[in-house]
A protein has these predicted regions:
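Short glycine-rich, Thr/Ser-proximal phosphate-binding strand/loop in the N-terminal lobe
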Residues: 15-61
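A structured beta-alpha segment of the ubiquitous adenosine-cofactor-binding alpha/beta core
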Residues: 52-84
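Gly/Ser/Thr-rich active-site cleft segment
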Residues: 93, 110, 123-190
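Short glycine-aspartate micro-motif
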Residues: 6-8, 90-92, 147, 207-211
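Short beta-strand-loop/turn "lid" adjacent to the catalytic site in phosphate-handling enzymes
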Residues: 74, 78-126, 147, 153-162
Length: 241
C-alpha cells in the first residue's frame, strides 16, 4: 500500500518550523526549523535519526529559499528520509488569523487565500508569512493539496457575550473588533488528549486548558466547544507573557 507523507509548516515572519509525518504509522519522519530568514546568521536546525540536533548555517534571503532548503534537507543523503520531495502528498499550514471567515480547517484555493489576505490587518506579521509558505510549496510542487489550519477556528463557537467588547457596536460591525482568541489548535488537542487519558467522553466535560509557550493563553471548553478564552482581538491580551 501507499505510504502517505504529510508535511506540516508553521511559517513566521523570520522563521519556518516543519515536520514530516508518515500518516500510515503516525510517526514523525523528520522535524526541524529555520531561523533568522533575511537576517545575518540564518540557519536550519534539525533532529537527526539518532535524536541529535544538527545546525546548518546558510544565507536564507526569503521564505521561498527557506522552504527549498528544507526540501533539500529532507532528500539529503545524510539527513534525509525521502528520495524525492514529490513523495510529499499534502501540506498543512498553521495560519494564525481566520477572523470570522473560518470555523474549521480548509483546503486552500484562491478564495481561501483572498480571505486570509483580508484577515491580514488583524495579524500583519503572521498571515502574510503563512501565505508565503503556501505560495512556496505551490511553486515547488504544483497542484499539491494544501490545508490551512487556523489558530482562531476553534474559538468560533464562543457565544457573543464572550467575544463582544464593551465598545460601540459599530466598531464590531465595521472593523471586526471582537475577541478572536488564539492557540486554538493547541487547546483543542490538549482538551481531547486529557479526556483520552482520563477515559471520559469529550462531549460532556467542562475543561480549562492552558497553552504555555512563548505566548500563553487559557480556554474554557464546555461539551467539546470553546466558550471563552483569554486572548482577544490580538494575542497580546490575557495572561502575562
Amino acid at each position: 500500500g501507499d505510504v502517505y507523507k504529510r508535511q506540516v509548516l508553521n511559517c513566521g515572519s523570520s522563521s519556518i518550523k516543519y515536520k514530516l509525518f508518515d500518516m500510515t504509522s503516525g510517526e514523525v519522519m523528520a522535524q526541524g526549523g529555520i531561523e533568522k530568514i533575511g537576517l545575518p546568521g540564518a540557519f536550519l536546525k534539525l533532529t537527526d535519526k539518532d535524536g541529535k540536533k544538527v545546525v546548518i548555517e546558510r544565507e536564507i534571503p526569503g521564505h521561498q529559499e527557506g522552504i527549498e532548503f528544507i526540501l533539500s534537507v529532507l532528500t539529503d543523503a545524510t539527513y534525509g528520509c525521502i528520495k524525492d520531495y514529490k513523495e510529499i502528498d499534502a501540506v498543512g499550514h498553521r495560519v494564525v488569523h481566520g477572523g470570522e471567515e473560518f470555523a474549521s480547517s480548509v483546503l486552500i484555493n484562491q478564495d481561501v487565500i483572498n480571505k486570509v489576505i483580508e484577515c491580514s490587518d488583524l495579524a500583519p506579521l503572521h498571515n502574510p508569512a503563512n501565505l508565503k509558505g503556501v505560495r512556496a510549496m505551490e511553486a515547488l510542487i504544483p497542484g499539491i493539496p494544501q490545508v490551512a489550519v487556523f489558530d482562531t477556528a476553534f474559538h468560533q463557537t464562543m457565544p457573543d457575550y464572550a467575544y463582544m467588547y464593551g465598545l460601540p457596536y459599530g466598531m464590531y460591525k465595521k472593523y471586526g473588533v471582537r475577541r478572536y482568541g488564539f492557540h486554538g489548535t493547541s487547546h483543542r488537542y490538549v482538551s481531547r488528549r486529557a479526556c483520552e487519558i482520563l477515559g471520559v467522553p469529550y462531549e460532556d466535560q467542562k475543561i480549562i486548558t492552558a497553552h504555555v509557550g512563548n505566548g500563553g493563553s487559557i480556554t474554557a471548553i464546555k461539551n467539546g466547544k470553546s466558550v471563552d478564552t483569554s486572548m482577544g482581538l490580538t494575542p497580546v491580551e490575557g495572561l502575562l507573557m
